[in-house]
């Protein structure tokens, strides 16, 4: 399976990466907030759903503080995933405080052949060194601040080390894909770098992603092979 992913999706297999597992979303959020506050260069966040409420406000407060000291912050979210969670002026509000913000596949009522092509990723990258991913979005219900569907149970992981490079690439590919001006981004490479880190854990890590912008079914094939 790992060879298939590397061959078809070009996501390499890494070592030299420490992994922290969160059995509850709120534990992931708490650690995420701590790491966001330490950012020195850039923060990339890509999520299916963002809710302009308590959980996000904790994150936004830190993002605004990091922007003030020169950290580059980019937010990317799926429009349909965030319907009912945020207002239409969300992008403008983020830009006003220095946070770059883009939307994937804005919802337009009527016939739309790509209506179901959604971005379900949940990714945070901090300085290209630390990354978070998992099953939780940035909405109150995922952290049990609210309970519209009962007690929510989800998981997440924190990566530190070489494998974070794949999360960085995954974010930038989607970020650049929705804007013509970034189709050939000359600065893409400056976010992909090696740094002096010695992991305490051993093993292999292979972050990978399927894209809503093509007809490839790599994610499906991986799960079928596992089953």
Predicted regions and their residues:
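Charged, low-complexity intrinsically disordered terminal segments
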Residues: 1-227
């Amino acid at each position: 399976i790992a060879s298939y992913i590397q061959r078809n999706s070009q996501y390499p297999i890494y070592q030299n990466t420490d992994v922290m597992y969160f059995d509850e979303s709120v534990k992931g959020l708490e650690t995420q907030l701590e790491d966001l506050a330490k950012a020195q260069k850039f923060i990339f966040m890509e999520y299916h759903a963002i809710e302009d409420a308590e959980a996000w406000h904790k994150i936004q407060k830190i993002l605004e503080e990091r922007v003030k000291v020169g950290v580059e912050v980019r937010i990317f979210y799926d429009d349909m995933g965030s319907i009912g969670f945020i207002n239409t002026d969300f992008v403008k509000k983020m830009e006003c405080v220095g946070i770059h913000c883009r939307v994937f596949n804005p919802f337009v009522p009527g016939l739309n052949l790509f209506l179901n092509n959604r971005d379900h990723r949940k990714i945070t990258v901090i300085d290209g060194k630390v990354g978070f991913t998992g099953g939780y979005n940035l909405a109150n219900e995922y952290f049990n601040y609210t309970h519209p569907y009962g007690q929510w149970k989800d998981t997440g992981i924190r990566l530190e080390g070489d494998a974070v490079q794949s999360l960085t690439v995954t974010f930038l590919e989607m970020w650049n894909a929705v804007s013509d001006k970034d189709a050939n981004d000359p600065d893409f490479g400056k976010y992909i770098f090696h740094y002096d880190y010695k992991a305490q854990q051993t093993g292999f890590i292979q972050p990978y992603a399927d894209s809503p912008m093509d007809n490839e079914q790599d994610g499906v094939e991986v799960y079928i092979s596992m089953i």
